[in-house]
């Protein structure tokens, strides 16, 4: 059973999605120093269910994603880490908090490209891009450009569509826990469509009702 250094965050990391961190807390600086001695250099990311990223004492969801370290820079100030989401896992047991969080994990089964319905994949892409395009017309900041380039691999693309979808963290966590790729695509379409209806309804209210 793999033992993995863990970095709980206030956001969800999906496979095939980038992750940029500014690390300043002492225990995570120690963690980064430790994992750089391993190949591949990786750690686990789980969503914090209750609590804060800094200081410990938080409660965490049990399904997360491994992050492979691509680059580390140490300018004057916090450590800057660039990583990429790789494989999903389930936490079996938290085994340590010092010198940094660690957990026994089991990897979740990877999806197969042959299982991807290309029609559903195309619909998910048009739905997510459509929602981003609508939000771009409002005075709202969106984390991803509407014309963002996605992977050619259908599994990676499905995860990336979930990752860039304009949803809250709990919706993202639900998508991360998808039991199969067809579920991932259908629920991405459904959840983003429902969110878009909410966005439009809120934006269509008269100014004195918003």
Task: Write out the residue ranges for each language-model feature.
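N-terminal low-complexity, acidic/polar interaction/targeting segments
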Residues: 1-210
